[in-house]
């Protein structure tokens, strides 16, 4: 049994982790890197014993998250405490190939597009604003058609289209339907 394990280790098939404090990784485990890049810092140069230089320490994820967050927050606070760069204090400093954009107004989206807000359907708003919006968005003809449809019963939607009489074959005429559709839309 020991011979099988020794054979697997010598072939490089077993990639299990070495236990902490024992032998280090074999250089054949990462064949793509040259040996000079594998161990640029010798553990003895750091002033530590060789066994402590490659110790794996288990850490909980919430603890690691806290440590990383604290380090990032400390870096951010340090950056905020430094004096600002002198080049950002000059508002006229512009790179030659950039164009300054005017500041965005409250009714503009990114890129300078105008933002049209739909009317509120909440309490205290009249229906007149909705018609103004519909007229500006879809043209006066559609707004008038909508007003005619709403003038009937309250809550009544558009009336159903009239049924066309069947032709000689007992089928509806295709030409009549397409003309009505084009007129509506």
UniProtKB/Swiss-Prot annotation:
**Effect of a null allele:** Mice are viable and healthy but show male sterility due to defects in spermatogenesis. Male mice display atrophic testes and the absence of spermatozoa in the epididymis. Transposons are derepressed due to DNA demethylation.
Where composition is biased (Basic and acidic residues), the residues are: 139-150
Q: What keywords sit in the KW lines?
A: Differentiation, Nucleus, RNA-mediated gene silencing, Spermatogenesis
Please cite one Gene Ontology biological process associated with this protein: transposable element silencing
Residue span of region Disordered: 1-38, 93-185
Q: Does the keyword Phosphoprotein apply?
A: no
Where, subcellularly, is it found?
Answer: Nucleus, Nucleoplasm
**InterPro entries per the record?**
C19orf84
The superkingdom of the source organism is: Eukaryota
Keyword Hydrolase listed? The answer is no
Any one GO CC term of this protein is: nucleoplasm
Composition bias, Low complexity:
26-38
Bias (Basic residues) ranges: 118-130
The UniProt regions of compositional bias labelled Polar residues, in chain numbering, are 11-25
What disulfide bonds does the UniProt entry report for this chain? none
> Sorted alphabetically, which Pfam families does this protein's record hold?
C19orf84
Q: What does this protein do?
A: Protein adapter involved in piRNA-directed transposon methylation by connecting PIWIL4-piRNA and DNA methylation machineries. The PIWIL4-piRNA pathway plays a central role during spermatogenesis by directing transposon DNA methylation and silencing, thereby preventing their mobilization, which is essential for the germline integrity.
Its assembly, as annotated, is: Interacts with SPOCD1.
Please report the name of this protein according to its UniProt entry. Answer: piRNA-mediated silencing protein C19orf84 homolog
